Regions:
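Structural recognition of the beta-strand scaffold that forms the well-ordered cores
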Residues: 48-53, 85-90, 118-123, 129-131, ...
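Preference for extracellular/luminal or secreted protein segments
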Residues: 27-80, 116, 299, 308, ...
Length: 642
């Protein structure tokens, strides 16, 4: 369907650009977009509204799927023939700088063959626990930024993300998360949020968007109207937030309004029920019964509230449509039709595409939408509005004029994961470290030439980061010659299961761990709260129970010994260690995926979380601690009966 029409589109673009020479400003842009739109077929409009992924691929000659990291003839032909509006990358796709650069260029060349419309090349580069660039700068994450209390750090984070993505030709990031994390039991947002104060979240998001804009990268505020006050992950279920419009306007919606007023170009919808905003039900072709509409499928929420009342003029994109919040209730065709009628402009991952055979599913969706338009179920004017928003965004960001010659591999290699970006990352991570408890001025540690310090990570990929922090402290002269520092871990993670090196209940220690605990005079241990329900203290959980018992063992063996806990994930576990001498929160547990020491002779070129290293550096006194908790800590029910 693509090639002949793409030549018509090229003609329309040329005529539009000639006409624009006598025009200026918005008029020129509108003329070009209108001309493009008027020459598009109905099916092209539908596919322009699609953001597809090629996360993994199996060619006709392959025995199994593998990560799609290099263009092949099958995907090339698909992108040439379908006028997709966008392609989204995952970590599977963008592992190394040169490889990522080549893949981006190849996708755009396929999309623009016969003068087709260039793509929005997209990824979720949030920073922190959600980052995609395998060789990029991970950053400490949004909650760490919130803990610094300085919006300039959010702007710097936006600049780092923007500089690295733009150098690779990735023009859109589905970030920042502007959800207000006001539910400690939230399993999916947590560290991805700047915190629980809506005003602060708005200011931080605004600064990060400003940083992205300096490198012409499109930002996307998510997940509208808010995913912060949920206890269900919409990847696996359908959450519900039972709040009134007034309550939302006074809290969850505040950061979105700030972003809209600033000119945010894209907002992502959430697969969440908001019954007080919309109690409409529709008949589901999949479940064969009446079902409520989540935000992504709600006209009242996306059109009436977001576009009309709040004044959003940009592109509304869905969260991934293969998530259970949608897919468990609606089939793919019905879900896409409902989303379009709700006011969605860009459909993220309408179906999974991993081989040529999967294209039949996508064709069925396109056919279904085309039939719905022809039957009057969807007005073509709704598609025209959506495509106009997408093309206007591409025009405003210069994407319609994409040229491979505007990009340089040398620049990408010099930018992605650069020493300059890593230095800024380190500084921000250190500023975020929050000392919650510091009995008798335990911190910074007073290390002498006779000291014996034991650093205990949760997992192997964190161990190298603790070692790196200690080496930085030694280089700074804070660990004198003669002092001993040993590094171990208490979890043995395998693909099949997690096995403790030391039992969580403290009943059976391994001899090697016992020897280390008896040997040390100072214990620094990571507590990785991860996705635990914080309504109770999980002393029988490996990630928190084990470090609790490590601290307890050392304190009972010799009260003169020093114990320090690093809360490396959501900070709600900081009150679980009453016996510890000092407790700090670092807001990120990402390790080094190569399990190598970063920056040394065997340094890793992969993006690694800076948070744990920063915590170790603060413990030894390389940096002071200035962070503040950006969330309140609910009181635990102190029980082991979970």
């Amino acid at each position: 369907m693509g090639k002949r029409m793409k030549k018509v589109l090229a003609s329309a673009m040329s005529l539009s650009m000639v006409a624009s020479m006598a025009m200026s400003g918005v008029g020129a842009t509108t003329s070009r977009v209108d001309s493009l739109l008027s020459n598009m077929s109905l099916r092209q409009k539908i596919t322009q509204m699609m953001m597809v992924d090629f996360r993994q691929w199996k060619t006709a000659d392959d025995e199994a799927k593998s990560d799609f990291t290099k263009m092949n003839s099958e995907v090339q032909k698909i992108v040439e023939d379908y006028d997709f509006g966008s392609v989204i990358f995952f970590a599977n796709n963008i592992k190394e700088t040169e490889q990522s650069f080549d893949l981006t260029m190849d996708l755009q060349k396929a999309a623009t063959k016969d003068n087709g419309i260039p793509l929005l090349i997209t990824t979720d580069q949030e920073g922190g626990i959600v980052y995609r660039l395998g060789s990029g700068t991970a950053l400490p994450g949004n909650m760490a930024l919130g803990a610094t209390g300085d919006v300039n750090n959010a702007k710097i984070a936006g600049e780092i993300i923007g500089s690295e993505l733009s150098s690779l030709g990735i023009n859109t990031t589905l970030a920042p998360v502007v959800d207000v994390n006001n539910n400690a039991n939230n399993p999916v947002i947590g560290l991805r949020s700047y915190g629980e104060d809506a005003e602060m979240v708005g200011k931080m998001a605004s600064a990060e968007i400003e940083g992205l804009a300096e490198y012409n990268v499109i930002g996307c505020a998510k997940h509208f109207p808010g995913h912060g006050d949920t206890a269900t992950d919409s990847h696996y279920g359908l959450p519900m937030v039972d709040k009134s419009k007034e309550e939302l306007l006074n809290n969850e919606l505040k950061p979105y309004q700030v972003a809209i007023n600033q000119g945010i170009e894209m907002i992502m919808s959430a697969h969440i029920l908001y019954p007080q905003l919309d109690d409409t039900t529709v008949y589901s072709e999949q479940t064969k019964k009446q079902e409520k509409l989540p935000s992504t499928l709600s006209h009242k929420i996306l059109t009436n509230l977001l576009k009309e009342e709040m004044g959003f003029k940009g592109v509304v994109v869905t969260d991934a449509m293969n998530m259970a919040g949608i897919a468990a209730t609606y089939d793919e065709v019905q879900a896409v039709k409902l989303a379009i009628n709700a006011g969605v402009d860009l459909i993220c991952m309408p179906t999974n595409i991993t081989c040529l055979e999967d294209m039949s599913k996508l064709d069925a969706i396109i056919d279904g939408v085309e039939k719905a338009v022809n039957d009057g179920e969807i007005q073509e004017s709704r598609l025209d509005d959506a495509v106009t928003r997408i093309l206007t965004l591409k025009e405003n960001k210069g994407i319609l004029d994409w040229k491979e010659s505007n990009y340089s591999l040398e620049k990408a290699l010099a930018t992605v994961g650069s020493d300059e970006n890593k230095a800024k990352e380190r500084e921000i991570a250190a500023k975020a470290v929050t000392v919650v408890k510091n009995e008798n001025n335990t911190l910074p540690l007073n290390v002498t030439k006779k000291s014996k310090v034991l650093l205990v990570a949760a997992e192997n990929n964190q161990r190298s980061l603790m070692k790196y922090g200690a080496e930085r402290a030694k280089n700074a002269g804070l660990i004198p010659d003669g002092a001993e520092v040993k590094v171990t871990r208490y979890m043995d993670r395998t693909l099949a299961s997690d096995a403790t090196v030391i039992n969580a209940d403290g009943s059976t220690y391994t001899s090697s761990m016992t020897d280390l605990l008896d040997w040390c005079d100072t214990l620094v241990v990571v507590s990785d709260n991860s996705g635990l329900n914080v309504a109770k203290a999980h002393y029988n959980n490996n990630y928190t129970g084990t470090p609790y018992n490590l601290v307890d063992y050392v304190e009972k063996a010799d009260a003169s010994k020093t114990t320090v806990v690093i809360s490396a994930n959501k900070p709600y576990d900081v009150q679980m260690y009453p016996n510890a001498d000092a407790i700090m929160a670092v807001y990120g547990s990402k390790g080094d995926p190569t399990e190598q020491l970063i920056g040394g002779a065997t340094g890793s070129t992969s993006a690694s979380g800076p948070n744990i290293t920063a915590g170790v550096e603060v413990a030894f006194g390389v940096f002071g601690a200035s962070g503040k908790l950006p969330v309140r800590i609910p009181k635990y029910v102190l029980t082991t009966n979970v």
